[in-house]
């Protein structure tokens, strides 16, 4: 842009900028906000990352995309915790994506709902009819199987150094290893993985973090 307009002013932002990424995308005509709270575009469905670049160049404004979810409430009906309250609104305190990133104890109700999820939840995207036929694969975002679906037991006592070297390049690593380890313990309970009992006992007895110890004790009770 600066090659064509040398004196242009540019400001880019994403996620934590002063503007709402979703509102900007809607006004740019890229899509509309669905009942699941995602911007839904004809080309990508909900499977997109949002960001914007502000420039001091006058453009003709785009027309907003005139579309909607109609009477469809599949995402609301299928949300595991009832976090979607309709019309694109979300109770974040109940959202599994949020819960898997917290660092504290989880209520039993949410431990059961999380199941085998280590980080995040895509249920409201996976069930959305607007995503049918959308290719969610991208050549620049291809993860190795052991990264995409890691073995659970090795996560339990993974060092900070090992965690950073293995997962540090992923967005999900920003919260550190503690939530991932807690979620791995919950997943082992979900799978009733009896072979993990020795490792869970080791964690329950010797891990210095009370939350991890408590979750391990709970998991042992669920498995046995």
Question: Model segments located where?
Answer:
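Alpha-helical adaptor scaffolds
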Residues: 145-178, 185
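Amphipathic alpha-helical scaffolding segments comprising HEAT/armadillo-like alpha-solenoid repeats
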Residues: 162-166, 193-205, 224
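Alpha-helix N-cap/helix-start positions at coil->helix boundaries
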Residues: 174, 178-179, 194, 208-211
């Amino acid at each position: 842009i600066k090659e064509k307009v040398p004196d242009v002013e540019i400001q880019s932002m994403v996620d934590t900028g002063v503007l709402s990424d979703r509102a900007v995308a809607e006004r740019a005509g890229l899509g509309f906000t669905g009942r699941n709270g995602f911007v839904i575009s004809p080309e990508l469905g909900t499977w997109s990352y949002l960001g914007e670049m502000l420039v001091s160049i006058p453009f003709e404004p785009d027309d907003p995309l005139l579309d909607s979810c109609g009477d469809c409430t599949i995402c609301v009906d299928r949300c595991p915790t009832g976090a979607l309250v309709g019309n694109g609104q979300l109770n974040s305190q109940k959202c599994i994506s949020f819960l898997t990133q917290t660092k504290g104890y989880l209520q039993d109700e949410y431990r059961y709902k999380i199941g085998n999820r280590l980080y995040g939840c895509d249920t409201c995207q996976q069930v959305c009819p607007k995503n049918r036929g959308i290719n969610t694969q991208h050549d620049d975002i291809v993860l190795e199987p052991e990264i995409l679906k890691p073995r659970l037991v090795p996560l339990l006592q993974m060092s900070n150094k090992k965690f950073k070297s293995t997962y540090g390049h992923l967005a999900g690593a920003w919260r550190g290893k503690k939530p991932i380890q807690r979620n791995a313990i919950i997943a082992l309970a979900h799978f009733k993985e009896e072979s993990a009992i020795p490792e869970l006992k080791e964690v329950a007895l010797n891990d210095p973090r009370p939350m991890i110890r408590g979750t391990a004790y709970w998991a042992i009770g669920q498995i046995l």
